[in-house]
UniProtKB/Swiss-Prot annotation:
Descriptive protein name: Small ribosomal subunit protein uS10
Pfam families per the UniProt record, alphabetical: Ribosomal_S10 (PF00338)
Quaternary structure (record): Part of the 30S ribosomal subunit.
Source organism, top-level taxon: Bacteria
PROSITE patterns: RIBOSOMAL_S10 (PS00361)
Keyword Ribosomal protein attached: yes
Function: Involved in the binding of tRNA to the ribosomes.
InterPro entries hit by this protein: Ribosomal_uS10, Ribosomal_uS10_CS, Ribosomal_uS10_dom, Ribosomal_uS10_dom_sf
Lineage: Bacteria, Pseudomonadati, Pseudomonadota, Gammaproteobacteria, Alteromonadales
Gene Ontology terms describing biological process: translation
SUPFAM superfamilies for this protein: Ribosomal protein S10 (SSF54999)
Length: 103
C-alpha cells in the first residue's frame, strides 16, 4: 500500500471520549510502523435550542440547551497491511462516530 493515505474523521459529543479514541488510533498506527499526522482538532459545532418553559403565557421564561459536536482528523501516511488489520480490529468507545476514507 505504498503512497497511500488513510483519513479518519471522528465525531463525538464528549471531548474526553474522542481524545481517548484518537490516542488509541495513533498508538496503534505508530506501533505497526505507519507515519501519523494528527490528531487535528476541527471546529466544534454548537447547536443551541431555546425552549419555552411555560405552556401558555410568560414568553420571557425560557430555557436554553446546547449540544456540542467535537471533531478530530487523523491522517495515516503509507499504511502497511499490518496497520490496516490492527485498525479494523480496534474497539473504540460507543459514543464516537468513525468515518474512514482511503486516498
Amino acid at each position: 500500500m505504498a503512497n497511500q493515505r488513510i483519513r479518519i474523521r471522528l465525531k463525538a459529543f464528549d471531548h474526553r471520549l474522542i481524545d481517548q479514541s484518537t490516542a488509541e488510533i495513533v498508538e496503534t498506527a505508530k506501533r505497526t510502523g505507519a507515519q501519523v499526522r494528527g490528531p487535528i482538532p476541527l471546529p466544534t459545532r454548537k447547536e443551541r435550542f431555546t425552549v419555552l418553559i411555560s405552556p401558555h403565557v410568560n414568553k420571557d421564561a425560557r430555557d436554553q440547551y446546547e449540544i456540542r459536536t467535537h471533531k478530530r482528523l487523523i491522517d495515516i501516511m503509507d499504511p502497511t497491511d499490518k496497520t490496516v488489520d490492527a485498525l479494523m480490529r480496534l474497539d473504540l468507545a460507543a459514543g464516537v462516530d468513525v468515518q474512514i476514507s482511503l486516498g
